Each structure stands twice: as C-alpha cells, then as structure tokens.
Amino acid sequence: MMTLAAALVFLGMAAQKPVATTVPGDPMATQCYTLSNGLKVFLSVNHQSPRITAHIAVRTGSRNDPAETTGLAHYLEHLMFKGTQQYGTSNYEAEKPLLDTIEARYERYRVETDPERRRVLYHEIDSISQLAAQYNIPNEYDKLMAGIGGQGTNAYTSTDVTCYTEDIPANEVDRWARIQADRFQNMVIRGFHTELEAVYEEYNIGIAQDQRKIFEALSAKMFPTHPYGTQTTIGTQEHLKNPSITNIKNYFHNYYCPNNVAICMAGDFDPDEVIAILERHFGSWKPNNNLYRPEFAPIKPITAPIDTTVIGQEAEFVALGWRFDAGNSLQIDTMNVVAEMLSNGTAGLIDLNLNQPLKVMGAGAYSDEMTDYSMLLLLGYPNEGQTLEEVRELLLGELAKLRAGNFDDDLLVSVVNNNKLQYLRALDNNRARTSQLVNAFINHVDWAQEVGKLDRMAGMTKNQIVDFANRHLLDNNFVCVYKRMGVDTTEKKIDKPAITPIPTNRDKQSDFVRNILGEQVEPIHPQFVDYSKEMTVGQTNKKLPLLYKHNDLDDLFYLGYQFNFGNTADNRYGTALGYLDYLGTKKMSATEFKQRMYKLACDMSFNVTDNYITIWLSGLSENMPEAMALLEDLAANAQVDEGAYSNMVEAIIKSRNDAKSSQDECFSRLSAYGTYGPRNAYTDIMSAQQLRNTKPAELLALVKGLRDMQHTVVYYGPMTQKELDKCLKKVHKTKKNLAAVPVGTPYMEQTTPQTEILLAPYDAKNIYMMQYHNEGTQWEPEHAAVINLFNEYFGGSMNAIVFQELREARGLAYSAAAYYRQPSELPHPEYAMTYIITQNDKMMDCINEFNNIVGTIPQSETAFALAKESLMKKLASRRVVRTGVLNSYLSAQRLGLDYDINSVIFNALPGLTLDDIVKFEQQSMAGKPYRYLILGDEKELDIESLEKIAPIRRLTLEEIFGY
C-alpha cells in the first residue's frame, strides 16, 4: 500500500512531467515543451530517414559581449568543444590548478602594455599550458559524436544566438543527451591559447572579405548606441589578442542556463520517448534566477541619410539599410514581404527593372531579423563606368515605385504563393525545420505566431504594402555604405605567437568516453538504394530515355532534360542559355514571362557543367504543364534583343575582371590551374572578343537545337508515368530521329611527376594553400572502402589527424583538411590533396607539419576503431529519398555502376584494419611529389624556405584566369 509520503513524491514527480502544446494547422506538427527549470524543447517528427537534427540554442550572442572583451561569445562557442570535468581530461583534479594559473596569467597579460613583459607573460602561459596539456585529451567531444554516428558537428554565433548543431542516428538520443547535459553544465576551459589562435585565423579570413566590412560599417551607423553597431561578433583584433578567461566564465554562468536555452529537434523519433530522455538528463540543470541581460536605450530615429565609406580590394558595391522593429514584431512579416516584392530572383521590382535590363551589374533586397531590431537591406553592384551614387539612385527609385503603388497587382499574391512553396520544400529538410524553431526561440516569437505567418501574409493588401513603404522606407531614413576599391590601411599585421605544440594524446581515453562508447545500442540496419525498386528506368512514348520516380509525399515536381555533353564540347552553351534570362517571345515580353513563371510558383534553371547540360523545371505540380509550355516556347521562339546581348556581354566581362579582386575566386582559379593545367572549366570560356563578335541569333540557334538532340528526361513528382508521358507528348515535341550530341575533350587532372611550387599573388594577411599529388591511378569500386575510411581517420573531420595536429595542437589554422579524392566520373583518376588557410608567417610551419603527418601517418588503434565505427553508423542510418534516388542513380552511372556504391563500402569496412590504412597512405601519398599551390603576398612569405622545397613558378592572375 502506498504511504502518504510516497504518494506525495509520486504526485510531485507526475507534476514535473512536461506537457506538450501544439498549434493547429502547423505543417511541422511541432510539440512544444517547457521543463520545470525553464528549458524549452521543440520537437518536430519527420520519418524520412532514421536520423535526427538536434540544435541547442542559447539566447545570447555578441550583443551581450562585455565591451572590453568583444568576440567573447564566439570564442566561448569554440571552447564548448574542449570537454568538461569528466572528459577532455585524464585527471581534472590535477589539471584544475594549472588551468586556474593560466586564467590568472591571462588577466595580467591582457592589461600589460610593455611588449617585453607581454612576451614573458605569454611564454609563461605557453609553459604552464604544456604542464596542463599532459592531462588534456583533445577532441574527446568530437570522438563522442563520431562514436555515436554524429555528423555535421558544428556551432555558430551571431548577434543574439549561439547555437550548437548535431545530426545523429535516431537510436542515439539517450547518449547524445547525456553528453550534451554534461557539456552545458560542466564545461571546462582548456587548450585556450591554441584555440584562440584558431579564432584569430578565422578573423584573418574575414578581413579579406569586403562584404563583412560593409555590413559592419552599416551596422555601426544603423545602431550607433547599441552593441549591434558598437561591437562585432568576431571581435576586435586587440580584444582577440587580449582575452579574459574570467569574463568568459562569468558570461557562461550567466547565459548558459536552462531558462535561456532551447533544444530543437527534427527527425525520426517518438516525441514521448525523447522528452522523457531530455527530462531525465536535463531536468536537474539549475536555472539562473538572476539571469541578467543588458538593456539599452532606444536608438534615435534616422531623419537624414547617413553616408559612410569602406575600403577594400574586392569589387565595388553599395549597400543601403533601413531599421525596423524587433524580430518578434508583426511588422517583420510586412518587411519580409516587401523585401521579396523588391527582389525574389525572378519577378521583383529590382529583378525586372534593374537586373533584367542590366541597368546595374546586379542588385537585390534582403531582410535581417534580430532580437532587438531588424533591417531591410538593398545591395547594388555597378556596371563598368557606372558610379556607386548612380546605383544608389536606381535602388531608391525602385522604393519610390513601391511607395507609389507602381507595381503589378499580382506581385503580392505571387510572393505569398512562392513563400508557401519554399515552406513546403523546407519541410523535407530536418535542418530547415530546426533552424526555423531556433530563430523563433531566439527572437521571442511565439510558435503560434510563427505558424500563422503565411496566413498573415496571405491577408495583406496592396494598400497595406504601399502604406507600409510610405511610413518606413523613405528617402531620408536610411544608412548608405559605399564600398570602394583601395588599400585598407587600418588592417594591422600581428606576428604569430611562440606556441609550443601541445600533445594530442590520441591514445588516451577518459572513463566517461570509454563508458559512453562502450555501451551497446540497438543498431540501425542499413538500407541501400535498389534502383530497380526505387525508380523506373524506361522510355517516354517518344522513345526518350526516362528516369522516373513517383512523389507520394506532396505536390512538388522536378523535371529535367539532361544532355550528355557540356562545356568541353562547346563552350558557347553557358552563354547561350544565360542569354535567355533577358529575352521574351512573340507572345510575351521578358518581364511578362518572368511574372507568369513566378505567379505559377515554378522555377526554371539551366546548369552547364564540363560534360552535361541540364534544363530544370520545378514547383507546384498543378502548374507543371503551363510552366513546361512557357519553357518550350522560350527555348524555341526567344526573340533576339541586340541591346540585351550587348549589355550582357559587358556585364560578363566586368564580372570576370571583378573576380580577380576576390581571394576566394583567385584561389579557385589557382586550384583549377594546378590540378587541370591551363585548359580547365574556368579558362575554357568564350573570350571577350568572341563574346563581342558573336551574333546573338547564333546563340539562340544553339538553344533551339537542343530539343532535337539526344537527351534524357528526369522526373520526380506526383504524376503517374502515363500522365507524364501524355504531358510530354503534348508539350515537349521532338523529332523522331534525334541528333547525336557533340563529343568533347574532357578536362583531365594532371599527374605530378616532380615536386614544384606554383605561386600566385594576392595581397592579404593570410595564404590559401593546397598540396596536390596525382599518379593517374584509375578508380575501381574496390578502392572506395579504404579511401572513405582513410579520409575519416586522417583528414575528414574534427576528430581526424589533420585537425588535431594543425589546429588543436598548434593553432596554425582555422580551416585545414586533407583528402584522397575519388572521381565523380570515369575516366578521371584518384588524387591526393591537402588544404589550409593560415597567417602568412605560419606558412612553413603548416608545410612542415603537413609533410610530417603525410610522410609518416600517425597511428592510433583507438582513433582508427572510432573512425570505422563512425563511418559504419553514418552509412547504416543514411537514406536516399525523393530526388536523391535519381541523383544517386546518375552518379552511379557516371562511375560505370548500376548499384549503390555505399553497399560495397559498408560491407568491406569490417574487414579493414589500421595496417590497411597505413599501407594505403604509404603507397598513395607518403614520399610522393606534390604540386604546391599557394595564393599570397610574396613579400610577406618565407620565399627562401620555399625554394628549398622546390623551384617556384610564379603565375600571374592573367595566367590562372585565362584572360
């Protein structure tokens, strides 16, 4: 018989059981919970594959950084991967006094101004860090996630959010929850000075990106008395070099509490089981009843345009911004609709009036929702000879049309319909679901309000839009930032610190990790694609090859016409198909065509690659026949517009020249040049002279002729095959005897018979570097398992050798990787590559370390077993669904296969040993000649040491770009 005391305990426990709330009409069927400690939980079920996307969102970001240590929220995000009192260490009791000493030294270091004294203090920090490192077991969090089959382990920080992301097998919720509960309650700051250096490398990447500069400058003027404008998420150079562990701890204890956190999950699970697990592991997490969030006085309205300028070496552009209310304001619905009425990529005012007639190089409208305020932004890139001031006036002119109601009556309805289409597509993706949940939580948007957004949009009228624009989007209440080309003299060079590499201790394992990974869970059995069952390979009634898969989940369709030739056969097709974007037909102008397609909520795209041309149509199935007819009419009857062609050519030429100012673009071209040689996908293009001399009618003839060439129809949608045949017969009219497609000469990866260095110029504080080795080895299916396992072990994750040695142990880079690449198509060969972005004066450190670990691969049975287990769990829980089945089939065909290669990999993995991996690496990578591809500022590099490796061949931008 139950005693009174026991009954009271039972009733108390029952009262603690979280109760779900739902919102009628929610397409995601989200179940919302609040635990007794204030922790929010949002669960959305999606049974497509046995995996779960799990995001843990903390309602804090750089907005709440202490003013004297900006960047703190972001580098706390990094430190959350360093372990707890239970893992990441072999002896926390012995480690803690050393960590406390490091903290105290940093408090002295950050206020010290004497350079010599700072050097001595940093040396002390480095020395004590060596003592602490004997207990440190780096990457144990990553090992835990790998061990349970996690993938996509990451995090991000912004103004108002710090979010930790995972994608786990559906059978691993309990172990994931235990790990996270410990992580969020017992985080320990260790490996601090090497991780901080990795953050600084991330800062170096950002300073070469002018879009970051313009956003920061715009925010500074838009929010002059608020942290959105007075500080940045990455932090200042000075603050990053003078951090405070004490401030980080205080920040963590204040904001990382259950009443300031949400767990957002989407995937294959039973909500009742999941909430019970979360209650069990997170329920004892103590709330912060004194949670402090700084508040700031309202910002004064902008009553006159505020102009500012930033300097950088990338292409010029202009940005305009208007300030709006908090992210949970109903005003934001209208702001987002207005942004899409201005620019949606197809039929917005800016799309039709500026982009299509090429009155500017490119322009668009974007919205940015934040917790305290939001923004609507307009961006514009000038044509050759056009000033930024002229672009600004053109953008303001489109706003004037909005205020005057000078837009098509169907535009608002079309925007709403396309939002519904985008929402429907997003339901297919677990990450999209969790991101929506996270954003609502961070911005204090009630879930019922979020669910009702589309209905509220549907209820908007043209008069409301016009009134909104006249109240909020004026020609005197905005900020304007001009991004001009030049040398930014504010960027300072800081020499690398003297860091003694910390030991990786990769064979050590904490009891916590050993116990967690030693547990047995009910396995998920793999399901590989059986193409004979999952899809139909057949013919249309016109004898066209057909790849068909029925969509029984929703009303979306994807229709493609694939031609088995591409740029290698005729490099004019990309330009020809791009030209269609500016043309109309005898029946419709270019503007009318785009408006009609957008109203149908259908998208049309052309994809020209090395060896394939694909014309894609997608959207709502009920509108597919009309969208097909529009596409066919455009391809067959597009009207030549000489002016549009001339403008397009000049825009292409300018965009090519602008690309030379981008660090990312320059490295992409150098990588292609070093891999394929002077003839590659970037350089095998129509020259400026060819573009100018070509008659546009010739290009339209190419497009018109496509329909009469051999091609394959690819379809995923709700139509039956018979219905599709009928539709194709009526609309997609082809000749009885189709012409053969032209044959191209493929761009082939070059072999590397000797070591050499290719150096291309770019003025930046860091280098981009790739090492490339290719013996011309032909790929075989039997190679796939050992290659995939090698990549998992050596260079493919945060738990891999490369990440541990280059970033964790030495702080040499933010981004580093190494892979043995498999081809996507035969007869292309396999090849090896490494990749890193690092500060200029760390170049030789990176090269030497890469050469060390490639020359003699570090061996760890523990790490190998974990890599194998992780890869097998990922493959077992992987499901290929929807259009993925068709894409998987096409990929297999290009490798000469008629089966899912993952089945071969999975079945071979159990028999592979560490010796197999070592042997493979020694045969394929160690001691081989490599081609070093380095993009950087030569005067900042150790050229003397480089020349000891191999002769340097200096390339010009003209050589790697081909023009």
What are these regions (language model features)?
Residues 34, 92-292, 326, 356-517, ...:
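Charge-rich, well-structured scaffold segments of protease-associated domains
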Residues 23-58, 534-550:
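Mature N-terminal segment immediately following signal peptide/propeptide cleavage
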Residues 46-49, 257, 313-314, 372, ...:
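Short strand-connecting beta-turns/loops that link adjacent beta-strands
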Residues 46-48, 57-61, 84-85, 169-171, ...:
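Solvent-exposed coil/turn segments that connect beta secondary-structure elements
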Residues 17-29, 522-534:
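Short acidic, Pro/Gly- and aromatic-enriched capping/linker segments at domain boundaries
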Residues 38, 47-96, 320, 330-342, ...:
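Active/ligand-binding-proximal structured segments within catalytic/core domains
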Residues 204-207, 220, 290-347, 379, ...:
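His/Glu-based metal-binding/catalytic segments typifying zinc-dependent metallopeptidases
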Residues 1-17:
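Bacterial Sec-dependent N-terminal signal peptides
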